């Protein structure tokens, strides 16, 4: 197992493909472990010509706890630590949901390490966009469980509320949720990640100053972070390109993988 050290925090990471190829760093959303980026999905990026890095954010999976009161900048610096450990100078940074916020912060705070930004199903932090439905917000704020059966049911409830309509395989999701629980169950860490996201507030003015090739992707069926969050992100980042994916909710089941990989490959080729 590979770990990168960032002061007192140890970050678990995995790689796919040839390190000589352009590196694509995949950053997870709230509470998600690196295995949420399924291995087959990572291999599709490898086939598209990328060296892929996935890692557990601090406070989840096999990475260590973060100190109280950490920020999105601290979480972005964990990605830098992984790149340092691999001796990689620059990377294309792909983040979903909270991972998109971390990726945006990476581009803002570490521009010399950011080859390009891909912000997926995320938002700027402005309170007037990217808002959840009442049902999604209530479920998001439901505390996690240290009981395996309840943790699995909570995962399935999330899929039913904000997953992509017509693309939810409950049997597969139940199996995956069990694998996630068995790998690491750390609901308290999820709460600290959520606090970091809330403390950051609006990134709009900082995003306006970015000088990095940017692709913003959002599904039109997202009930957790409304598509207005993605639209605003693309509006404020200079020369950003926006891709709306029809039928995609606040997840990326394998039905959408080819579309996502193709979009990222085209984005890279146009830089």
Question: Where do the language-model regions lie?
Answer:
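Short beta-strand/loop motif that positions the catalytic acidic residue
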Residues: 210, 216-218
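Active-site nucleophile elbow and catalytic-triad environment of alpha/beta-hydrolase enzymes
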Residues: 190-206
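Conserved alpha/beta-hydrolase catalytic His-Asp/Glu region
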Residues: 151-192
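Catalytic active-site module of serine/aspartate enzymes centered on a nucleophile-bearing elbow/loop
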Residues: 240-271
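Conserved HGGG/HGGXW glycine-rich cap/lid loop of the alpha/beta-hydrolase fold
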Residues: 7-65
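Active-site loop/oxyanion-hole signature of alpha/beta-hydrolase fold enzymes
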Residues: 60-94
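Flexible "cap/lid" loop of the alpha/beta hydrolase fold
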Residues: 117-146
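Acidic catalytic loop of the alpha/beta-hydrolase fold
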Residues: 221-225
């Amino acid at each position: 197992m590979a770990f990168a050290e960032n002061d007192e925090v140890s970050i678990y990471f995995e790689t796919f493909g040839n390190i000589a190829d352009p590196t694509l760093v995949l950053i997870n959303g709230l509470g998600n472990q690196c295995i949420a980026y399924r291995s087959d999905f990572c291999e599709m990026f490898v086939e598209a010509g990328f060296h892929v890095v996935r890692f557990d954010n601090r406070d989840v999976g096999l990475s260590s706890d973060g100190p109280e009161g950490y920020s999105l900048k601290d979480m972005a610096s964990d990605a830098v630590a992984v790149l340092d450990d691999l001796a990689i100078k620059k990377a294309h940074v792909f983040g979903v949901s909270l991972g998109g916020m971390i990726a945006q912060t990476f581009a803002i705070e570490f521009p010399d390490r950011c080859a390009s930004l891909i912000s997926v199903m995320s938002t700027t932090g402005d309170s007037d966009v990217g808002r959840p439905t009442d049902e999604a917000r209530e479920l998001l704020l439901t505390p996690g469980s240290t009981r395996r059966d309840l943790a699995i049911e909570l995962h399935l409830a999330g899929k039913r509320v904000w997953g992509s309509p017509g693309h939810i395989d409950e049997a597969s999701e139940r199996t995956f949720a069990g694998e996630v629980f068995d790998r690491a169950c750390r609901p308290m860490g999820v709460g600290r990640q959520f606090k970091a996201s809330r403390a950051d507030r609006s990134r709009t003015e900082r995003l306006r100053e970015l000088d990095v090739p940017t692709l913003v992707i959002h599904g039109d069926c997202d009930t957790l972070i409304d598509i207005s969050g993605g639209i605003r992100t693309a509006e404020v980042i200079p020369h950003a390109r926006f891709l709306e994916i029809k039928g995609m909710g606040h997840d990326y089941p394998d039905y959408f993988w080819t579309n996502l990989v193709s979009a990222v490959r085209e984005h890279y080729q146009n830089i």
